[in-house]
A protein has these predicted regions:
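Beta-lactam-recognizing serine transpeptidase/beta-lactamase-like catalytic domain environment
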Residues: 6, 142-152, 195-240, 245-479, ...
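Short beta->alpha transition motifs characteristic of CBS
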Residues: 8-13, 19, 115, 203-209
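Conserved, well-ordered alpha-helix/loop/beta-strand core segments that scaffold catalytic motifs
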Residues: 146-189
């Protein structure tokens, strides 16, 4: 939204010409004092350089002001050297070169990525668009027609990227996430905010962030690459948020309607294995809204078996499970959806997969899949690039649609069902003044081959306002300790984030929008 997140600045490499140095002690003293380096180490390397070297680097990526201070000191000492009072800093050399700078330090670090000492981009935007940002000649594919490509003129200064990220919303998401980790004792967390109509990502907050200006500290912040941006890289079992997709498939195949009822006995047998509801209790006669409201596993297993494995997995594939979304950030994981015919697929998997167990997804995959429900059946491709400016011309990136897995009627029906289910239970996810659709998720984490209820992935995905969706928010808290349930942890975080979102995006409450529309 018009704020600079990554730019360019001039830094300096400071070294010495070993053939012309006259006073190594003066150089070691001046450089150590100005740059905060160890004098003894500097004098040792200057006096005992590696064999065969004529030029020795003392420091690199030195701030321009510090380099200027040393240059001025060198000039002053050269004037004194003319009188024979000092050897000066003869031999000290300065080489300028560009370095990527990040004015907001750690803000959105997981989205931006960084450029290393050699000028190569790693992670995020920096890696995915490395050729564009580095100023190399590039070819851009316009996503509205994959058969057409347009040349963008080569300009050595590189390309200015305009992102979809809303700076203030990103900062708010990071603050809310940090507070949520403390409040609920969670190990890690993620909040993603997207426009479900276009796929424009407005914020991607993760709990581990680094000051990109100090990229060399990467190893001290992260244990592995998936931790840099778990929103796109880290796979996990989503749990009950996936029930949205199972219900969508059941409605779309006319397996059920919202008013279809069944007798919930609390357990069901599939593939020789008994599956129970989350609370191990029967819930009696329920319709499909009650199925969602009470998040009944038995209901989902019944839906999947009535549809049949072929229908169920065809829909899950159409929703993109097990596939890359195509997000324009480096490091995306595809996750995995086992299907009949795979060596490790068993009949019971049809049942467990129906309520989000035994499926590996990323948060961005769930956002893409559920966008079909919020967007009249059309699934969007999440992206962070809004446009590019080159040669004074702006090239905007149009929305991409990844398919139409369900009908618009199914999407509208399910949205209303989800909204009713939240309202009926007075969910902590509700947002005053706005009707919201969404679903909680509580997925037990497998430990040594067994699921442990004390360790869960708590989540909530929701969107609104439901009559004109302008935002979709996904909250994922890993291993909350205050409560394992998504309804008690992720849901209130969603509500807080949504209330901030409608303010920052200037979305009026439902009654005001309805009054305006009726005029």
């Amino acid at each position: 939204n018009g704020r600079l997140l990554a730019g360019q600045k001039t830094v300096y490499e400071i070294g010495i010409d070993l053939n012309t140095v006259t006073d190594p002690h003066a150089i070691a003293f001046a450089v150590s004092r100005e740059l905060g380096l160890n004098y003894d180490q500097l004098i040792n390397v200057i006096q005992s350089p590696p064999e065969g070297l004529s030029y020795l680097v003392l420091a690199d990526f030195v701030d321009a002001q510090k380099a200027l201070n040393l240059q001025e000191l060198k000039r002053a000492l050269q004037e004194q050297a003319a009188t024979g009072t000092t050897g000066g800093l003869t031999g000290l050399q300065f080489k300028s070169h560009p370095q990527r700078s990040y004015p907001e330090n750690a803000l959105a670090s997981n989205i931006l990525g960084f450029v290393n000492r050699e000028g190569k981009g790693y992670f995020g935007i920096e890696e995915n668009y490395d050729n564009l940002l580095a100023g190399n000649a590039v070819r851009v594919l316009i996503p509205t027609d994959p058969n057409k490509a347009y040349e963008i003129p080569h300009v050595p200064d590189g390309t200015t990227m305009i992102l979809t990220i809303n700076r203030d919303l990103q900062a708010a998401a990071e603050d809310i996430l940090d507070n949520a980790l403390l409040e609920y004792g969670a190990q890690d967390g993620t909040i993603v905010i997207m426009n479900p109509k276009t796929g424009e990502l407005l914020a991607i907050a993760v709990s581990r962030r680094m000051n990109l200006n100090n990229f060399w500290n990467y190893d001290t912040v992260y244990n592995n690459a998936t931790e840099f941006n778990p929103a796109i890289s880290k796979t996990y079992e989503p749990g009950s948020v996936l029930k949205i997709l199972t219900m969508a498939a059941a409605l779309d195949t006319n397996t059920v309607t919202p008013n279809t009822t069944y007798l919930d006995t609390g357990a069901v047998l599939i593939g020789g294995v008994t599956i129970q509801n989350w609370d191990r209790n029967p819930w009696g006669v329920q319709n499909m809204v009650g199925c969602l409201q009470h998040s009944l596993n038995v209901c989902m297993v019944n839906l999947a078996t009535q549809m049949g494995a072929n229908n169920f997995y065809t829909y899950m594939d159409a929703f993109g499970l097990g596939h890359l979304t195509g997000i324009d950030l480096a490091g995306e994981s595809a996750g995995r959806l086992k299907i009949p015919g795979d060596a490790d697929w068993y009949p019971v998997d049809l049942g467990t997969n129906s309520f989000g167990q035994g499926v590996a997804v990323t948060p961005i995959q769930m956002m893409a899949a559920v966008s079909a429900v919020a967007n009249d059946g059309r699934m969007v491709t999440p992206h962070v690039l809004f446009g590019m400016v080159r040669d004074g011309r702006q090239y905007d990136v149009p929305a991409q649609f990844a398919g139409t897995p369900i009908s618009a009627q199914t999407a509208d029906t399910l949205t209303e069902m989800l909204a009713l289910s939240l309202e009926s239970e007075a969910s902590l996810a509700l947002v005053p003044g706005y009707r919201i659709a969404g679903k909680t998720g509580t997925a037990e984490i497998p430990v040594n081959g067994f699921y442990d209820i004390s360790q869960t992935n708590a989540s909530f995905i929701g969107w609104g306002p439901i009559d004109d969706p302008q935002f979709m928010i996904y909250v994922w808290l890993e291993k909350p300790t205050v409560s394992p349930w998504g309804a008690e942890t992720a849901a209130p975080v969603f509500s807080e984030m949504a209330q901030k979102t409608v303010i920052l995006l200037d979305i009026p409450p439902d009654f005001i929008r309805q009054q305006i529309a009726s005029q």
